[in-house]
Swiss-Prot record:
Protein name, as recorded: Transcription elongation factor A protein-like 4
GO cellular component, one term: nucleus
Residues the record lists as Phosphoserine modifications: 6, 88, 102
Compositionally biased spans, kind Basic and acidic residues: 25-102
Superkingdom of source: Eukaryota
Alphabetic keyword roster: Acetylation, Nucleus, Phosphoprotein, Transcription, Transcription regulation
Family, as annotated: Belongs to the TFS-II family. TFA subfamily.
Function, as annotated: May be involved in transcriptional regulation.
Organism this protein belongs to: Homo sapiens
């Protein structure tokens, strides 16, 4: 009996030892499993971080060429504007540089202008117009009136106006002649004068310095 009891106790102790040994092993296993899960999570986090960093780097790399392309386009536009401005300035410079040559010519032009009379400065067309007198214009107007569709009254009225113009011209000529006559009398005291200071009539002979008696 004692042997059986001792054997039973030995079996119980062995079972207790086995259970105690199995329990810590079982307890350690969850830790191992936890550590494995943590490692997996860490690896996944690392991969996510790596993916994020890779995406960010890709975006940065994509953004850089765009910014570089914009910078290049801006530079090309600025260079084009500078070239345009430089070309315009270069085109404007030859005109300015050509001025000294044109400035050297005014001396010869002024000399030629000094030799020419003042009438040569008037254009030829203007000369032709000014050379025509009032009588010529009236004659042309008379010829043109016949071609116009005027009634008899209008024709008579136009001819009357033309006659008035001719009379005014004649009177103005007489006034100018009298004015010139007065100036001539004032300038030359020995100019022959008629009665009542009118031109013509009985004129006294002109007396020169030789005819004045010596006193």
């Amino acid at each position: 009996m004692e042997k059986l009891y001792s054997e039973n106790e030995g079996m119980a102790s062995n079972q207790g030892k086995m259970e105690n040994e199995e329990q810590p092993q079982d307890e350690r296993k969850p830790e191992v499993t936890c550590t494995l899960e943590d490692k997996k999570l860490e690896n996944e986090g690392k991969t996510e971080n790596k993916g994020k960093t890779g995406d960010e780097e890709m975006l940065k790399d994509k953004g850089k060429p765009e910014s570089e392309g914009e910078a290049k386009e801006g530079k090309s536009e600025r260079e084009g504007e500078s070239e345009m401005e430089g070309g315009s300035e270069r085109e404007g410079k030859p005109e300015i540089e050509g001025k000294p040559e044109s400035e050297g010519e005014p001396g010869s032009e002024t000399r030629a202008a000094g030799k020419r009379p003042a009438e040569d400065d008037v254009p030829r067309k203007a000369k032709r117009k000014t050379n025509k007198g009032l009588a010529h214009y009236l004659k042309e107007y008379k010829e043109a009136i016949h071609d116009m569709n005027f009634s008899n009254e209008d024709m008579i009225r136009e001819f009357d106006n033309m006659a008035k113009v001719q009379d005014e011209k004649r009177k103005s000529k007489q006034k100018l002649g009298a004015f010139l006559w007065m100036q001539r009398n004032l300038q030359d005291p020995f100019y022959p004068r008629g009665p009542r200071e009118f031109r013509g009539g009985c004129r006294a002979p002109r007396r020169d310095i030789e005819d004045i008696p010596y006193v």
